[in-house]
C-alpha cells in the first residue's frame, strides 16, 4: 500500500512511474545476512560481549540463531557473488535509474520488536529485505515517510545508481 500511495504522489507531481522487475532482492538480502554475520562475529561481537547491554547481547544471539554465517572460504565466495549481484543491479539501473520500493514488507513493527523474541527479530529482518539486500550491493537509497498505514507510520525508499545519491535526493 505504501508503494502504491507513493507512486500516486510521484505521478501526480509529474514523474513517470512504471512497474519493473528488478534483479533479485531476496538473494541480496540472504547474502547480506550470511556474510555480514561473519563480519559481525569476527569484529563486533567481542566488543558487544565485553561492553554491550544484556539486551544487545540477546539480539545478537538471536541474530546468529537465525542462520549460518560464512566461514572464511565461503566469505570469499560471497564477496565474489556480491560483485555479480552488483553488476546485475548496475545493468538494470542503466535503463531504470530509480526504483521505488518498500522499506518494510509489513506494517511498521513495535519499536522494541527485536528485543522481545527470536520470532520478532526474524520478522524484522525478513520484512526489511529491500534495506539489507540493497545495502549489500552498495546502492544508495533514501527513505521517506508516506503517512500512516494500519495505524502505524510507514515509509518507502527510492533506490538509485551507485555514486548517484544526487538522483535519489532530487
Task: Show the residue positions of the predicted features.
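Small-aliphatic-rich amphipathic alpha-helix that forms the alpha element of a beta-alpha
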Residues: 90, 121-144
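Short helix-loop capping/hinge segments that flank enzyme active sites or metal/cofactor-binding pockets
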Residues: 35-90, 143-153
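Short, surface-exposed loop/helix-turn segments at secondary-structure junctions
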Residues: 77, 108-128
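An anion/phosphate-binding loop that grips the pyrophosphate of nucleotide cofactors and donors
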Residues: 96
Amino acid at each position: 500500500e505504501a508503494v502504491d500511495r507513493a507512486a500516486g504522489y510521484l505521478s501526480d507531481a509529474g514523474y513517470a512511474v512504471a512497474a519493473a522487475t528488478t534483479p533479485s532482492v531476496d538473494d541480496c538480502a540472504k547474502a547480506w545476512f550470511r556474510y555480514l554475520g561473519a563480519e559481525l562475529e569476527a569484529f563486533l561481537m567481542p566488543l558487544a560481549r565485553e561492553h554491550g547491554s544484556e539486551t544487545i547481547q540477546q539480539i545478537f544471539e538471536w541474530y546468529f540463531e537465525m542462520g549460518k554465517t560464512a566461514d572464511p572460504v565461503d566469505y570469499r565466495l560471497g564477496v565474489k557473488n556480491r560483485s555479480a549481484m552488483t553488476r546485475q543491479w548496475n545493468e538494470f539501473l542503466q535503463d531504470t535509474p530509480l526504483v521505488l520500493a518498500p522499506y518494510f514488507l509489513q506494517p511498521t513493527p513495535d519499536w522494541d520488536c527485536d528485543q522481545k523474541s527470536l520470532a520478532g527479530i526474524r520478522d524484522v529482518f525478513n520484512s526489511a529485505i529491500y534495506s539489507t539486500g540493497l545495502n549489500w550491493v552498495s546502492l544508495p537509497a533514501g527513505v521517506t515517510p508516506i503517512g500512516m498505514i494500519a495505524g502505524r507510520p510507514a515509509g518507502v525508499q527510492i533506490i538509485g545508481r551507485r555514486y548517484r545519491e544526487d538522483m535519489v535526493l532530487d
